[in-house]
Amino acid sequence: MDGVGLCANNKQKQNQMLPNKMRGEFTRNQRKDSEGLSEAPDLEFEYSDADKWTAELSELYSYTEGPEFLLNRKCFEEDFHTHLPDQKWTELDSVQRRAHAMRLLDGLEVIGRERRLKVARAILYMAQGTFGECSSELEVQHWMRYNVFLLLDVGAFTALVELLNMEIDNSAACSSAVRKPAISLADSTDLRVLLNIMYLMVETIQREEPTDSPEWRTIRETFKSELGSPLYNHEPVSVMLFGMVTKFCSGHAPHFPMKKVLLLLWKTILFTLGGFEQLQSCKISRRAALGLPPLPEDSIRVVRSMRAASPPASASDLIEQQQRRARREHKALIKQDNLDTFNEKDPYKADDSHEDEEENDDNDNSLEAEPFPLERDEVMPPPIPHPPTERMCFPKGLPWAPKVREKDIESFLESSRSKFIGYTLGNDTDTVVGLPRPIHESIKTLKQHKYVSIAEVQIAKEEAFQKTPLSGGEEELELCATELLYQGILPSLPQYMIALLKILLAAAPTSKAKTDSINILADVLPEEMPTTVLQSMKLGVDVNRHKEIIVKAISAILLLLLKHFKLNHVYQFEYMAQHLVFANCIPLILKFFNQNIMSYITAKNSISALDFPHCVIHELPELTAESLEAGDNNQFCWRNLFSCINLLRILNKLTKWKHSRTMMLVVFKSAPILKRALKVKQAMMQLYVLKLLKVQTKYLGRQWRKGNMKTMSAIYQKVRHRLNDDWAYGNDLDARPWDFQAEECALRANIERFNSRRYDKNQSNPEFLPVDNCLQSVLGQRIDLPEDFQMNYDLWLEREVFSKPISWEELLQ
């Protein structure tokens, strides 16, 4: 009894030493989760532009749309057998298939909505691979590719864009949807069918296959250039889709199927601008064109070769380990002999002791461990050698080559000169007179690792254009897909960013339902709500999956735009980034990560039996509550891990080299949120978390750094080093009071000057416009005078010319 009372008193004292919030966490039973995390293997996740083709196809459809597959088939077969009785699509020759496809396209031009919808469903069935005549999923995929290229060749995409524009401008449908109290799947039928066909075409054509014929390759390149050019309604398709997003968020079109719009927008941007591999190759060629040295390494390859680090521990883990160890020591004093005898026979002893040792080894970095300084030697024992199979193999040396900016060299020289010789030389980075030999060596090392970014060259060129607008000459503007897209979205870019973040907020798992939030479930909720438990569970899975796909699409859209704009021109990137910051993107992403991120990544919100194309080939098994709860057998959810990495990369892009935005991370207390995300054992995700922790480390205080040494070691090991970057201490010159408004206003002024100079031709300074001073040229111009002026010409001549004294000598000089 005494022993029990002593343990209870110790436990009570330890609880009292904890902060209130942590005390609540400690009372929850988190042991199972934390132990599972510490023992969890690395997630075998390969980051890429998108998931497998079949996964991307299946995510287009909600499970509620399942019955429409057979409806599409029925519409196609009725029309097909009317013109070609007793024949199959797969048995026709290419001429017959082309003729039927063109016949269907003609049907899209009829006035009657019902007839037009039936034809659109028949075309959708073609794009879905005419699955009724296929016996396997591979066969469906084969006919999908064939039919989609055929549809594109006969001009289906242009017709679909025109129909989509007509549906967007359909005021009757919009006003009807606004008046409805509850919007369901039936309100967006026409839009969903059109968007489904367009998405299947873009998604299928953008994926190259080794077996593609030269004709298909030519069609793909032509489609890619047309999709990124203002050929459809005098604007790129992406701009039209952005317009749908803002119209939906403004409440004027609540029936728009937003998941499909966002997926099509993402794939259109991905296809026209290029993915991450193309970005890397474009960056290499752009640096070569500017005369800059090549990149020190291939960042994509380096990240793929990295291994995940062990996750840091939480306070509850540390305390439970101490209690467990105290209990073991107490038992050892009472029954040492009996325990020795038992341990000889205990088959789990080795595993248990190894588990404790490994946890102790992992849990040496928590700030919350500070209230127990006397027990630090117990909390942090010497490292235990791991078995060879579990040892993490790092390449010799650090994965990244260090980089130095010109600004870093200047500041180092300035501080050295003022310290040793008492004067400064401004921006001079060559004069080293009077400085000691070690400083010479330091400068030499810094210059060896000097890195000039494309952005620095672009900023310097822009400054030159602003300083010398006349002698600077005309800027050579390459009208690539990125430039055309920026010109298209520039007038309404702030509204587009706000709309995307609104939808992201509504789809985030941490968001609570509010009356003023937008309804993003219009294209997933059925007309009749479920009546059984099984139907409710299925709809719950569908809704969660729907939200996850929306988060995935928005995160990919934002990241692709930021990266492409930064490569095209840094001020395009800064314009978009600044509006994201003004729309509270930073706290929104932090709010997203302020959840059990491991549960989000391992969520099983999918029913593989209902995924396309599996559901149209195989018979649907009987769904039970147990099978819905079990989900699939995957270690993690690809789309959720993809979304998390994208959001971290966006956060990193917004805050990089921005002191005021880095301080926002500190003010919003992002460190504990980000530290929890390190529990996900995936190298790329950990890298971007560590980058975000690194930039704010010097502002978090000595106590935080002291209590998080394992995190500091991981930063040193995985994040690129900037020579002279005093990130691990608070001595940096940047650790100063910050003025968010001043920094952002200065940046905004530069952005506005850039946009005004390059895109606002009407607002050009009249002083710099060309003037025709030749008298003969001016008098020789033909000017059309209005009819009333010609009738009253004599009056004008008398009033304005004859009655006023004119010095013709001065005028002609």
UniProtKB/Swiss-Prot annotation:
Modified residues (Phosphoserine): S310
Keyword tags: Cytoplasm, Phosphoprotein
Start-end of Basic and acidic residues biased regions: 22-35, 331-352
Family (UniProt): Belongs to the STRIP family.
Subunit field text: Part of the core of STRIPAK complexes composed of PP2A catalytic and scaffolding subunits, the striatins (PP2A regulatory subunits), the striatin-associated proteins MOB4, STRIP1 and STRIP2, PDCD10 and members of the STE20 kinases, such as STK24 and STK26.
PANTHER family, alphabetized: PROTEIN REQUIRED FOR HYPHAL ANASTOMOSIS HAM-2, STRIATIN-INTERACTING PROTEIN 1
Keyword Cytoplasm among record annotations: yes
Composition bias, Low complexity: 307-316
Composition-biased stretches (Polar residues): 9-18
Entries under InterPro entries matching the protein: Far11/STRP, Far11/STRP_C, Far11/STRP_N
Biological processes annotated in GO: cortical actin cytoskeleton organization; cytoskeleton organization; heart contraction; regulation of cell morphogenesis
Region feature (Disordered): 1-41, 307-379
Acidic residues bias: start-end ranges: 353-367
Free-text function comment from the UniProt entry: Plays a role in the regulation of cell morphology and cytoskeletal organization. Required in the cortical actin filament dynamics and cell shape. Part of the striatin-interacting phosphatase and kinase (STRIPAK) complexes. STRIPAK complexes have critical roles in protein (de)phosphorylation and are regulators of multiple signaling pathways including Hippo, MAPK, nuclear receptor and cytoskeleton remodeling. Different types of STRIPAK complexes are involved in a variety of biological processes such as cell growth, differentiation, apoptosis, metabolism and immune regulation.
Gene Ontology, cellular component aspect: cytosol; FAR/SIN/STRIPAK complex
Pfam families according to UniProt: DUF3402, N1221
Official protein name in the record: Striatin-interacting protein 1 homolog
Disulphide-bonded residues: none
Subcellular location: Cytoplasm
